[in-house]
Each structure stands twice: as C-alpha cells, then as structure tokens.
C-alpha cells in the first residue's frame, strides 16, 4: 500500500463494497451482492441497513449468478442512484433512493442498456457499467473495458430520465497497460470541473469472471472534453471499486475509497486517499 492511502474506517456488517457516497456524517455504501443500501454514521459508528430489493430469500452474499451486481452509487440533489452493471440480463436494475422521504423506487434499465449496446457498438460480453455521474441534465456512465474488446470509455447521455434516453455518445478512454492488461474504470465522481476516477487491472478478459488483481489507480478527466489529465497507481495489490469526495485542504484533495475483496466476510475497510 502506498503512502497516500490510509485506513479511514472498518465497518462490520458490510461485505463486498462497490460504491460509496458521503453526506455530512453519513457514509452510504452499496455492495454488488447485497439487497441493502448501507448507511454508516461516522460519529456513533452505527450501521443502518435500508432494504432496496424486496422478496429475495437471500439479502446479503447473494450468489454470483443471481446477484443484482450494483456497481454504481451516485448522487444528485436529494436522490441516490444505484445502478446494476448490465453485464447480464439480471443486472439491469436502477434503484432511486430519495433521501428526504426515505423511499425506494425501482426502474428497469433493460431498454437503456439495449440502446447503449447499439449506439456505442458494445456487445453483451463487453457492457459493464461501473460508475456514473448525474448533473441534473446529463448522465455520464463509465464502462469498464475489462472484456475482450477493451471497451473502456465514457457513455454520455443527454436528458435526465435514463429510461427514455435517446442521445447516446461513447468516448473511448485509453488508460494504462500493466502486465499486458489494460487498466479500466471502476468508479468516478465529479468535483468542480474535473472527473476523478478510480480504475483497476485484473488478469481476465471477462466482465463476469474475476481475475488476479494487478493494481488500482486514480486519475482525472476534464469534465467538458473528457481529456485525460493524469493516471497514478495507488495500490499494487488491491481492487478499489468506489470513490467519494471527502475534503479539500488548499491544493490537496482527499477522497474515500472502498475495496471489493470478493469474499463472503461481512466486514469492509474504507480508505482515505490523498491526491
């Protein structure tokens, strides 16, 4: 682990963490194999579980073939948006959780993901949405290019309603290559005029099967042009899958990141990352 990464919190009761969002003293966390949205209070260390999927026999550590694969947790105004990756037909769900009224709404992204595949020339083996940003007018979806076609890039969708998307554009983003494996997106957030992303490399060419972890990275894109500003390794052995803004001290940016350890142990570690 490199020096700009330090342990921020250890949370018992959460398994594989795939996304997070910080709102005042509440840290919201999702897992790709969980039917809960977790709310962790940073002051009293209490963990609240919000059930966002009803009628399931298993609510945590859902088997791989059945899991919703929630890889995206993003925020706009009073809503949290939780998106499935789209990597299989079972993973096409979006959950909207309205923070002010504490209500859950479900939306199908099957139609959207079909349009994305056509417009962006991404086949079923290569669609893998791992991050999203919503500005209120535009969506940016981050496709992880860990499939055999290396379709790493940003999908820009004009309009606020994803289920009615019409204008869809794809911008391929070439990051680094390590051990002959491409580094690809695992999450992204917008801060001021820049997109900050985390990315990882794995020894696999599948959006479904995990491989040996070859490292994690942080980088930045210009929010208007999607020009790559920088990419920097933050760990050689860990796979980070979620990022949220923490604080800024002068020119120093601090983020919180979470790790998907691909185990059944219900404990997760949140790290502070300084850039």
Where are these regions (language model features)?
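Sequence/structural signature of beta-propeller domains
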Residues: 1-275
């Amino acid at each position: 682990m490199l020096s700009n990464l330090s342990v921020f919190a250890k949370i018992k009761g959460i398994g594989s963490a795939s996304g997070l969002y910080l709102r005042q003293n509440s840290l919201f966390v999702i897992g790709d194999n969980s039917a809960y949205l977790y709310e962790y209070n940073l002051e009293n260390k209490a963990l609240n579980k919000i059930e966002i999927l009803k009628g399931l026999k298993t609510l945590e550590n859902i088997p791989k073939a059945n899991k919703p694969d929630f890889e995206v947790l993003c925020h706009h105004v009073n809503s949290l948006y939780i998106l499935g990756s789209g990597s299989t037909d079972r993973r096409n769900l979006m959950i909207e959780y309205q923070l002010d009224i504490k209500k859950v709404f479900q939306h199908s992204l099957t139609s959207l993901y079909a349009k994305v595949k056509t417009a962006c020339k991404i086949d079923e083996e290569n669609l893998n949405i791992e991050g999203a940003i919503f500005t209120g007018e535009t969506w940016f979806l981050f496709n992880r290019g860990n499939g055999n076609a290396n379709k790493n890039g940003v999908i820009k969708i004009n309009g606020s309603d994803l289920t009615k998307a019409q204008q869809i554009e794809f911008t391929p983003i070439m990051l680094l290559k390590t051990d002959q494996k491409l580094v690809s997106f695992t999450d992204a957030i917008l801060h001021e005029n820049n997109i900050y992303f985390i990315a990882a490399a794995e020894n696999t060419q599948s959006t479904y099967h995990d491989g040996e972890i070859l490292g994690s990275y942080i980088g930045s894109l210009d929010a208007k042009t999607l020009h790559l500003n920088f990419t920097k390794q933050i760990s050689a052995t860990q796979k980070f899958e979620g990022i949220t803004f923490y604080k800024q001290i002068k020119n120093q940016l601090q983020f919180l990141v979470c790790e998907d350890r691909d185990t059944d142990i219900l404990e997760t570690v949140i790290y502070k990352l300084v850039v």
